[in-house]
Amino acid sequence: MEQIVVTAAFIREDGRILMAKRLPKGPEGGKWEFPGGKIEPGEDPRSCMGRELLEELGIQAEVGAVLEVVSTVKELRQIIIIYFECRITGGELQAIECQQFKWVGPEEIEALDKPESDAKFWDGRKIASK
């Protein structure tokens, strides 16, 4: 079974959370996700998180604490996602490697079509905030 390790950013500003819509082609195309991407061989997860935010959205970020690690198995692939708390420190938000991005309130995240791993992560956030 192939194993892929990915980083994802939980970025919150003024009570709203940054979400990115995946490009239509590829796995989970068109779904909304916490922005991030695959760790390259030998790459540090925190470095990957910073690189992916710059590549996908044109922003620099402070990569903070690991919030959660979620594992899913789909089509003979295990995908492990490391969710980091991040804060934007520079750059200008742009949809570079995604269809679009938007800031949403916590209640709006429920209605978004998300990959299974992001849905699991968000369920954990809801429980933790109660």
Enumerate the predicted regions with their spans.
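Conserved Nudix-box catalytic region and its N-terminal flanking loop in Nudix hydrolases
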Residues: 16-55
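Conserved N-terminal beta-strand and adjoining loop/helix that marks the start
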Residues: 1-18, 38, 69
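Structural detector for helix-capping/boundary residues
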Residues: 15, 37, 51, 64, ...
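A short coil-to-beta-strand element that immediately follows conserved catalytic motifs
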Residues: 59-68
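NUDIX/MutT-family hydrolases
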Residues: 85, 94-125
